[in-house]
Curated annotation (Swiss-Prot):
Matches recorded under SMART domains: FN3
PANTHER family noted in UniProt: PHYTANOYL-COA HYDROXYLASE-INTERACTING PROTEIN-LIKE (PTHR15698:SF8), PROTEIN CBG15099 (PTHR15698)
Family as reported in the entry's similarity comment: Belongs to the PHYHIP family.
Name this protein carries in UniProt: Phytanoyl-CoA hydroxylase-interacting protein-like
Source superkingdom: Eukaryota
Domain Fibronectin type-III: 52-161
InterPro entries listed in its UniProt record: FN3_dom, FN3_sf, Ig-like_fold, PHYHIP/PHYHIPL, PHYIP/PHIPL_C
Function: May play a role in the development of the central system.
GO CC terms, sorted: cytoplasm
Amino acid sequence: MEVPRVGHSISSPTSPCEDMMKNLSLDAIQLCEREGNKSLDSGIAEMEELPVPQNIKISNITCDSFKICWDMDSRSKERITHYFIDLNKKENKNANKFKHKDVPTKLVAKAVPLPMTVRGHWFLSPRTEYTVAVQTASKQGDGDYAVSEWSEINEFCTADYSTVHLTQLMEKAEVIAGRMLRFSVFYRNQHKEYFDHAREAQNNKMLPSVKDNSGSHGSPISGKLEGIFFSCNTEFNTGKPPQDSPYGRYRYQLPAEALFSPKTNLYFGDFYCMYTAYHYVILVIAPQGSPGDDFCKQRLPALDIANNRFMTCSEDEDGQLVFHHAQDLILEVIYTDPVDLSLGTVAEISGHQLMSLSTVNAKKDPSCKTCNISVGR
């Protein structure tokens, strides 16, 4: 069953009961406090003979949908006309609150064969823990409902964006990518102590670390993928990296071919903004066959390294590798393997450390029409 916005008709191509559900509708009902396991909704009478849902099972969980089914005693089963589904974010213990203006946490569905699909990006977010409980109900002639007791409360967590969702994000990013500019180096800014530690304690290597939670909440790489962040953007008038950086006054710089070549795979990771005009795309470079490559193959859209709208590596007429990046996006490039400092150089930048431009744990603007898709943010 697909859960619509209040007052909208619905259809559910993903439901196994599609034909039976074309005329289903959901309405908001008054939210209620619970005392014990009873419903105290005003205007709703309790009838003990209505069966209480038992053994609730939740399956087919995506970033903005799930299937739900349960067992019921056959007693008075034929009297059931509706199901009440009480859905709440786990951290919100008060069922008498709205998640968002005009969006109820309690859903009313016409009784249909189970399992049914609950879908709705306006009340389901990716990577979020929820609690769910169910009542059976019988609509009376006067419009009131007779209801069963509440089922036990069950918990589940929604999933990350799938490759289908990421492909939708990627297509939106392609629209604003702009023309391609040539570049020749990757660079990474940090504090002096970071590079000193790499030399002294890490055998002269920068080591991958787990990506933070910046960007889209549903991105499958946040908090999971290990890598090292690099930049490749250049100033259009000089063709060189900018002298300012939000991440530190010391910059490690190395030839682009040291990280990006036909021996690596390239993946699209995310597209987001931080309440500003700047838009960011996260790309992942993974040496072929590496653990990072295996991780990305299962979760991210792969890009043709020689032909995409974000960052390319191709051969010129002389067989030399040439590199280009999109002008109108800020690219954040994650390299999934350790990098030896001997492959490049460290030097202090002459510009400013612009802390306001840092994307560390930055939250995506959920209202931006340019970089959001119609699933959980």
